Each structure stands twice: as C-alpha cells, then as structure tokens.
C-alpha cells in the first residue's frame, strides 16, 4: 500500500528484514491514546496498596500496553490478600463479578493495587479492587485510575472444601 499524506510509517529495521513477513512492507505507527482523554486523579489517601508492581515488556503487546489478562491476574492476587486476611486462612477465587478497564497501562508505569472487603457471606468474601498507575516513578505527577473490579473468594478448609468465614481453619497435621 503506498504511503498516504498525513500517515506516519516506520521502515523495518535490520532484524525485521531477516523475516520474510516484513520484507518490502511498512508498518503503520499507531499513537497511544492521548492522556488528555484519561482523567488524572490522586492516590487514595489513608489507604495502603496491597500490591505494587512495574509491568515489563513481556507483559505488553507490541504497542507497549499491558495485556488485560495480566492486569486481571494482579487484581486477583491483590483481592486474595484482603480475602485471606478477613477469612483468616486459604481462599479460592470463585467469581469475577465485574472488571472494568478504564485506561491502558503502559510498560514501566508503577501500578498500585488497593483491595478492600466489600461483603462477607457465610463462606465467601467479596473484595473491591482498584488499580492506579504513576507515570513517573521518581516524581509521581500523573496518577490515573486504570481499572476496578469485584472478586468473590470462598474460604477453604484443609480438604479444599468451603468453610464458614468466621470459623478459623483447623491446623494441618
């Protein structure tokens, strides 16, 4: 396809030329979403993140945005931390009630996960998990809320059976 006015293209580099897929092709450069469209916010005051991590290139697509599955797994871990504390023992994820991606996470952005117990049932604990990013780790000036979710966990006994949340697990022999 011939270049059109106003479109930006990147020529293949030497390693790409070795692949027959990229010979005599041009790759269109897509611009990331403008940060003007993503509202900036502040980190939740008076709360401590249960998980903080910096995504690396293997966690992202070719455009530098982190995969949704990676974000979901980190949110599940963060929610499980709160659920384990409330259930005072092992838990297992049984449902992802809601999961909303509000903005993309880019490689290198410190991502903070906050989790709170939203509801306690007989054997289950539902946790609200929120994810925020700091664009510049050394001088966090751009903070964005990037995702929120509700996860449900079930308290498990030593036989991997549901147990009441308020009943402490028995010690394993």
Language-model regions, residue ranges each:
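Active-site helix/loop of acyl-thioester processing domains in fatty-acid/polyketide metabolism
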Residues: 69-89, 157
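HotDog/MaoC-like acyl-thioester-processing domains
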Residues: 28-45, 49-51, 106-107, 118-173
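Intrinsically disordered, low-complexity segments enriched in small polar residues
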Residues: 6, 15, 19-20
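A conserved, well-ordered hydrophobic junction motif at loop->secondary-structure transitions
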Residues: 58-74
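Small beta-barrel nucleic-acid-binding modules, principally OB-folds
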Residues: 88-104
